[in-house]
Amino acid sequence: MKFNIVSPVALSCLFFLFLTGTLAQNAGSIVTRELFEQMLSFRNNDACPAKGFYTYDAFIAAANSFPGFGTTGDDTARKKEIAAFFGQTSHETKGGSAGTFTGGYCFVRQIDQSDRYYGRGPIQLTHQSNYERAGQGIGVGQDLVNNPDLVATDPIISFRTAIWFWMTAQDNKPSCHNVIIGQWTPSPADTAANRVPGYGVITNIINGGLECNMGPNTAVESRIGFYRRYCGMLNVPTGENLDCNNQKNFAQG
């Protein structure tokens, strides 16, 4: 009988790939269709303007466009990333009763639509510059600038813009992805601004100018509440530093 011997170098490469999550399955191995329905059960309520828009298949198709999303690190790290992503986006799109943290993904469009580039989709993408960068990032060029409503009418594009934002560092902000998987190291400026690793700095990345460095507030608590619920469903710890109450926002340096 002939045996194939695997070299130490090959074994080292495989071990590295395992640690970095390269060999991990896609996000669908964590977010099954059943779990997706449990997490976002209110989204198809008759009271939700987004009823029927956010589908499991659209989420998985979009997630598969970003190989690192929900696949990096060990099982706990991967699940925490999913919980954090849905925690933040559920707050952005919430409806239903306050305090229950079950009403995520009820809205696809911002209520105030006075600006052409108003908030749309799971991350509530706003501002022309973000539509332009998102379009370039997901490979549709200027399509989102020319037709921003694609983010509210094409569910795969909608999820892709949200995951693009999540995965992408911008200006002096780290990516939400790097923060939640523990690959962000605060700079001296971050430390001076009380921006520390944890879920709270993700809130700062997304909406720090309106929610952070102003003490406890209902918006921050809502984001934390959704995150805690999803961490419980996935049986993972939330980690520390969940709020941004004393963090300066990134625009303040």
Curated annotation (Swiss-Prot):
Domain of life of the native organism: Eukaryota
GO molecular function: endochitinase activity
Catalysis: reaction(s): Random endo-hydrolysis of N-acetyl-beta-D-glucosaminide (1->4)-beta-linkages in chitin and chitodextrins
Disulfide bridge map: C212-C244
One Pfam family here: Glyco_hydro_19
EC number: 3.2.1.14
Enzymatic class: hydrolase
GO biological process terms on file: cell wall macromolecule catabolic process; chitin catabolic process; defense response to fungus; polysaccharide catabolic process
InterPro entries membership: Glyco_hydro_19, Glyco_hydro_19_cat, Lysozyme-like_dom_sf
Main localization of the protein described in the UniProt heading: secreted
Record-linked CDD domains: chitinase_GH19
Compartments where located: Secreted, Extracellular space
Stated role: Defense against chitin-containing fungal pathogens.
Protein name from the UniProt record: Acidic endochitinase pcht28
Source organism of the structure: Solanum chilense (Tomato)
